[in-house]
């Protein structure tokens, strides 16, 4: 996590320096607005917000605006559209779901530099993407389980939000390995939407009814 946060801070600083250099060529000191659209609120994302605030402190003519959508796609779309209407100088987005893509596209098409963080969109209309290789994460987990589980083992896959790119890519990577390993199999997939409460809910529901036994639980969360 710290590596991704530092990379994001460095990327923001580099973009700021580029904008400041362009500004200094004509002798004027412009006021820059950086907008951040967070899909949700948690300790991890608050740490990210803190890192961005630190980066912004290096420049007294930089204003940082942070909004959280609390896992509401409609709200995040509205927040991104408002940022675009305000013609912010830089937009950083952690998309809640891939369905948020049109709003990001609209901002990018207005000429606003866009950094996508943590989760991908459906298009390539962004300036930079910072995130994990989620397909490789799923592949690595599949290969590890295939090497340590006994033949005939059954796996319960606890997935993240079905419309978020990390869940989609981790599932693709994991399932691609299992498909080639006849010694292990996935008996069921549950979707917990990246929340602790959701994970408890779906697993408790499974265990309260007759279910096919499993030897291992693979959860998408990191």
Language-model segments: which ranges?
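Bacterial N-terminal signal peptides that target proteins for export
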Residues: 2-12
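A residue-level marker of the well-folded mature domains of exported/periplasmic proteins
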Residues: 21-222
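Bacterial N-terminal signal peptides
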Residues: 11-19
């Amino acid at each position: 996590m710290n590596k991704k946060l530092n990379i994001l801070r460095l990327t923001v600083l580099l973009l700021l320096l580029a904008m400041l250099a362009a500004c200094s060529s004509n002798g004027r000191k412009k006021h820059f607005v950086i907008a951040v659209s967070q899909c949700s609120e948690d300790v991890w994302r608050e740490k990210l917000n803190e890192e961005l605030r630190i980066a912004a402190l290096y420049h007294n003519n930089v204003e940082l605006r942070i909004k959280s959508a609390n896992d509401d796609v409609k709200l995040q779309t509205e927040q991104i559209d408002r940022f675009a209407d305000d013609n912010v100088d830089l937009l950083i987005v952690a998309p809640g779901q891939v369905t948020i893509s049109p709003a990001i596209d609209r901002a990018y098409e207005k000429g606003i530099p866009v950094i996508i963080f943590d989760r991908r969109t459906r298009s390539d209309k962004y300036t930079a993407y910072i995130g994990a290789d989620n397909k490789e994460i799923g592949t690595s987990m599949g290969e590890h389980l295939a090497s340590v589980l006994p033949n005939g083992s059954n796996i319960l896959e606890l997935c993240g939000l079905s419309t978020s790119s990390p869940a989609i890519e981790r599932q693709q990577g994991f399932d691609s390995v299992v498909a080639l390993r006849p010694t292990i199999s996935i008996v069921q997939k549950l979707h917990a939407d990246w929340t602790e409460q959701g994970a408890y809910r779906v697993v408790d529901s499974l265990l309260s009814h007759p279910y096919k036994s499993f030897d291992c639980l693979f959860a998408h969360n990191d």
